Amino acid sequence: MNTIKDLTVREREVLKFLVEGLSSREIADKLYISINTVQYHRKQLLHKTDSRNVAELIGKAYRFKLIDLD
């Protein structure tokens, strides 16, 4: 698995919102980006963390402390 420094600032923002349970539409609205852009970042996160789905991605986010949970 890649390290946290391999994740972009935007990918970390998207990951934080995914962990909080937001949908792609909600993330797009919060970050003022398109749903397609959110989906691109989700795809990149899955690839960079070798995750098969968002549930696994969220588990790895907690396990490897990929985000600041404050």
Cite the ranges covered by each PLM segment.
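Inter-domain helical "communication" segments and dimerization helices
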Residues: 1-6, 64, 69
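Helix-turn-helix DNA-binding segment
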Residues: 2-35
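Recognition helix of helix-turn-helix DNA-binding domains
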Residues: 23-56
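Residues within well-formed alpha-helices
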Residues: 13, 48-50, 60
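Short, basic, alpha-helical segments at the C-terminal edge of helix-turn-helix-like DNA-binding modules
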Residues: 54-64
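Intrinsically disordered, low-complexity regions of eukaryotic proteins
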Residues: 13-15, 58, 70
